[in-house]
Amino acid sequence: YMDLFNDEIVSFHIGQTPSAAGIQEALEEAIRITADCPYRRTFHSDQGWAYQMKAYTNRLKEERIFQSMSGKGNCLDNSVMENFFGLLEQEIYYGCVYHSYEELKAAIEEYIVYYNERRIKKSLGWMSPAEYRRKHAAA
């Protein structure tokens, strides 16, 4: 999950295969992290099977979180996450060889920490997502 205020990755799950349990785990973490949000929360996703499960949609309703979904086959509706995945692939995947699932998973986890804490963005005034969040929390 990404916070569109500062493009920070708030929660995620990495698994060898897609699973409902992994999606629910990331959802619960995103709910916990955003619980004190002063404005209405909107969780946006593509139309993948996991985001249409009753357990998922009911959990959003319980928390009064608005569910937004991309139009069918329209990657532009989810362009912010598509951009993040493009950066991730470009910066840690292409040209690299990972010898195990664990090695790839560790690289992705390290990249997310780097992306949130150190990777500056022009749109955030040349700050990292975490720096931008901290600056505006103090204001």
Please tell me what each predicted stretch does.
Residues 1-139:
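Charged DNA-binding/catalytic regions of mobile-element recombinases
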